[in-house]
Amino acid sequence: MFSISVTDDPSIGRRAATLVVVVVAVIFAAGLFDDLRGDEMARGFRGHVASASGGRLTGGLVKIAAGGLAGAIAAIPADGLGHKVEVFLLVALTANLFNLLDRAPGRALKVAFLFFFPLMVFGPAGVSVGMSGLVGALVALTPVDLREKAMLGDAGANPIGAVVGLALAYSLDEPFRLLALLVVGSLNVLSEKVSFSRVVDSTAWLKALDRIGRE
């Protein structure tokens, strides 16, 4: 499942930890900008594009631009145009996906841990090292988020998703990278029509998992 050629590439391994830090910083700044505005009326990709066509800058547009910038930076060490495009899209789209998941206490974190732990074990050494600090901080934050004493917000959920996308892009081989991109892209498109929270609440086993640890 995991590509030996990608995992063992020393140039990618050395740069990956730096990429994690840069990606988190860029996405965090955009997410914080959106959180601090707190007056957004536009919803979804189409809503933000419509606002832009009307000459109004929204926090969502800033996040879209930041996701593109972070994706472009993350793609720099990728080998070949195809891989660069996959890295770019996975980072940008996964950042947005986790923002969509952050609609209930602990939900985005639970999904993140499903990816982080296997990726830290099987992914490139640089990615594992780069993620370790973030994962440690998130483990400490989880009880606080579950008890609703604090919330991730865009400044938290978006960077988490971006790092998941980065790790997937540099840990999976070609067929699985494309599969991951297809799934993430499809979920982003689906979110324009379907409420993930409604799906979770109407599915017994998802609802049970969603409520684990919550008061």
Positions of PLM-derived features:
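Short, highly charged, low-complexity non-transmembrane loops/tails of multi-pass membrane proteins
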Residues: V199-E215
